[in-house]
């Protein structure tokens, strides 16, 4: 059975992900250290983890498997769940896979080095846009279909047994 995990702290697409999860009839876990509204649908569950570095990430990484989808911007978390067989969609609609996660990790590390070398650099990435939201919805829809197919294959086509 497919589950959808949301790295919910500062995630701009929680409502969109919830609509997709409900439409597909899959459980969705909003994982954060607090500060998000309680879910309105019984398929959606808020998971509150203790504060601390990477606590929410580890909760997700310990559970995500083949047939699941994870929404996160956290590249190290994405690498862990991709290695476990889950599909990853970033809030901007970019998908992370076995084929591109190594490059994403290298780019993340390079950018961290560049930021630390220039302490006067200010600003961040570009603002989240309507186009990003649209790309996310399209990518999540495709990932959900692919994950559900992978989940059926992994369980031998018998979801009643999962």
From Swiss-Prot:
Q: What are the coiled-coil residue ranges?
A: none
Q: Which InterPro entries match?
A: UPF0178 (IPR003791)
* A Pfam family this chain is assigned to: DUF188
Family from the record: Belongs to the UPF0178 family.
| PANTHER family to which the protein is assigned, alphabetical | UPF0178 PROTEIN YAII (PTHR35146:SF1)
Q: What is this protein called?
A: UPF0178 protein RHOS4_24670
Organism expressing this protein natively: Cereibacter sphaeroides (strain ATCC 17023 / DSM 158 / JCM 6121 / CCUG 31486 / LMG 2827 / NBRC 12203 / NCIMB 8253 / ATH 2.4.1.) (Rhodobacter sphaeroides)
